[in-house]
């Protein structure tokens, strides 16, 4: 699983994570390159990966209120898909963080990161609702030639996978 490095605190789970560090240091950049290389190796060896395309937790579009929206998806996943041609299974995760998280997210990144850890810890041992779509083999997306088009294609598929929850 490619995941925010702040969430890689459990030593038993660390071997299953490929951490992405959002701090703006040379060391973070090196670690991120390494994680991306390992993601490619995993796909080349047929190991399934769980990837969160925007790289961020969805946040309310107004400070503490409003609809929760994804940050723009990066084209990194499209690059992996185009290079390694895996079968892709879209998953939509339901749920929302607390209002306090959304308020903190609009103040400053350090507050957001602190609240991110708090929200994750609160979710341990709880049920996560998700919708799983049909798999997409390389033949289903081989006609797509640009990373941006591939990103948009799978974004639309994930959004279409979402089912209404009461």
Annotated model-derived regions:
Residues 1-30:
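Catalytic core of membrane glycerolipid acyltransferases/transacylases, capturing the structured
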Residues 33-166:
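Non-catalytic C-terminal accessory region of glycerolipid acyltransferases
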């Amino acid at each position: 699983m490619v995941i925010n490095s702040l969430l890689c605190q459990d030593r038993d789970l660390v071997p299953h994570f490929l951490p992405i560090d959002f701090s703006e240091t040379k060391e973070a950049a090196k670690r991120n390159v390494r994680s991306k290389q390992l993601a490619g190796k995993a796909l080349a060896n047929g190991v399934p990966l769980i990837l969160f395309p925007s790289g961020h937790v969805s946040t309310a579009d107004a400070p503490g209120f409003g609809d929760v929206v994804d940050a723009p998806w990066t084209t990194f996943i499209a690059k992996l898909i185009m290079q390694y041609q895996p079968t892709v299974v879209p998953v939509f995760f339901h749920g929302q963080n607390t209002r306090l998280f959304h308020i903190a997210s609009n103040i400053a990144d350090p507050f957001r990161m602190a609240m991110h850890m708090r929200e994750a810890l609160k979710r341990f041992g709880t049920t996560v609702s998700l919708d799983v779509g049909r798999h997409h083999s390389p033949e289903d997306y081989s006609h797509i030639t640009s990373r941006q088009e591939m990103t948009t294609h799978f974004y639309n598929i994930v959004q279409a996978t979402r089912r209404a929850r009461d």
